[in-house]
Amino acid sequence: MYGQQNNYGAPPPQQWGQAPPQGYQPGYQNGPPAVNYGAHPSQQQQWGAPPGPPQHQPYGAPPVNQYGAPPQHQQGYGGHSPQPPFGAPSPAPAGYGAPPTAPQGQYGAPSPYPQQPPQQGFGGPQQGYGSQPQGQSPMMYLGVPIPAPPPAVPVSTLAGYDARFDAERIRKATKGFGTDERTIIDTLSPLDAFQMDVLSRTYEQTVGRSLKSTLEKELSSWLEYTLVLLSLGPLGGDVYLLHRACNGMGTHEDLLNEVLLGRTNQEIFLLKEAYRRTYNQDLVQIVQGELSMKTERMFNMALSGQRDESPYLNHQLVQQDVETLYRAGPGKIGTDEIAICGILISRSKEHLKAIAQAFPARHRVSLSQMIHSEFSGHMRDALFFIARGVEADGDGVVRDCELLHAAMAGMGTKDERMIYRLVRNHWNRPRFNAIKNQYQVLYRNSLRRAVEGETTGKYEKALVGIIEQN
């Protein structure tokens, strides 16, 4: 639940890279505000807010640290002269990006299912969208095809897209005194993952510096953050966010939850390899250094990339897991956290959807409500994120609407949360359309109007451009 906040996410007036002015402390002040996540909007004191979705338990508040302020400039994914590949594996016969085969059941019971092709993450792949080259088996990330990372040969041209034209538009927009921010917004916001990748490479070849470094130099505050994150593409953007989550004072727990939980085995493999190439560090070790005790063990499970991905349902095992979850939580004194984590982290998406339907029918309380009552702190928020993703529509659309609404509800705007939730969701355009439609149903207000009510100027135009790109 969000507590009282002052100037959440307000960017400092000074240039990035300088010390904050005396007395300035980004992020929350005096603890977070008391705003129930996903509660009826009228309870959140929002002007003209329409009725909200059915009540459920709140997400947790972020720790008191620097989270919410625009990030300091950092060398990272997509930056100029990136770190050389470190430990990059040789191309596998089955294609780079396939996660290593590992025995099932390292955490929790062994899988009762035969090995199947990996399930699609983040709502499944979108059909008929994307300008990936013909004749290549697409690599999927956030439900969309993405360019294969090194050591695969990069795509240099795309049919129907002139990357040189867009690179020249950005060069002219950033040339001389002043910056044509609107041209940059109009150029970047319509691009899909393949187009963004080709543009970034073309820009660096023709201009002599990375697109990321140009955006950091020419822009500032939340507009800079938005367009830098957008320019990195789905995978690069998540790598950037993970570094943001673990860099500096404190840990941005909500970023770890949203980027690492509920992912396919291939997505986890891609994240770990891309993080190593970009920052020359092991992602597992970095995350372990930010967490402790059972929460660390939970994220070790997620980062192992050994989730069952069978499309087949074992209904007997579903009922068995429902009873295991109950006996590990409300059915005993104390809570067996690892038993619950083992099921929610390692079971397939279809299996968890079946559990989310069967649990309230058997025990008269939803899975997410049980988690909220049995857990606390970061582990509660992480497991609640997983549970809400398989409840309701079962595809996380309702959950993601609630998260977007939470970033804008109450006093002040949680800018960084709003930005990365919009950017990450927009890549899968059919799913993003479902989110926009569901947001209208839940809150009787369009997502665009909600964002317009929280932002101004070119920052507003950038986010509206992302929302309306299709």
From Swiss-Prot:
Biased composition (Low complexity): 15-34, 93-110, 128-138
GO molecular function: calcium ion binding; calcium-dependent phospholipid binding; phosphatidylserine binding
SUPFAM superfamilies recorded: Annexin
GO cellular component annotations of the record: cytoplasm; nucleus; plasma membrane; vesicle membrane
Pfam family, one: Annexin
Region Disordered, annotated ranges: 1-143
Effect of deleting the gene: Increases titan cell formation (low penetrance). Low or no sensitivity to high temperature or tacrolimus (calcineurin inhibitor); sensitivity may be background dependent. No cell population growth phenotype in a variety of conditions including high pH, low calcium, in presence of the antifungals amphotericin B or fluconazole, heavy metals (nickel or zinc), osmotic stress (NaCl), cell wall integrity stressors (Calcofluor White, caffeine, or Congo Red), oxidative stress (H2O2), or nitro-oxidative stress (NaNO2 or H2O2), or following ultraviolet light radiation. Normal mating.
Positions annotated as Annexin repeat: 161-232, 233-304, 316-388, 395-468
Keywords for the protein's UniProt record, in alphabetical order: Annexin, Calcium, Calcium/phospholipid-binding, Repeat
UniProt-listed SMART domains: ANX
Domain of life assignment: Eukaryota
Alphabetized PROSITE patterns for the sequence: ANNEXIN_1, ANNEXIN_2
Biased composition (Pro residues): 82-92
Family to which this protein belongs: Belongs to the annexin family.
Function: Does not appear to play a major role in virulence. May play a role in titan cell formation.
Domains: entry comment: A pair of annexin repeats may form one binding site for calcium and phospholipid.
PANTHER family, per database record: ANNEXIN, ANNEXIN B11
Name of this chain's protein: Annexin C1
The species this protein was found in: Cryptococcus neoformans var. grubii serotype A (strain H99 / ATCC 208821 / CBS 10515 / FGSC 9487)
Higher taxonomy: Eukaryota, Fungi, Dikarya, Basidiomycota, Agaricomycotina
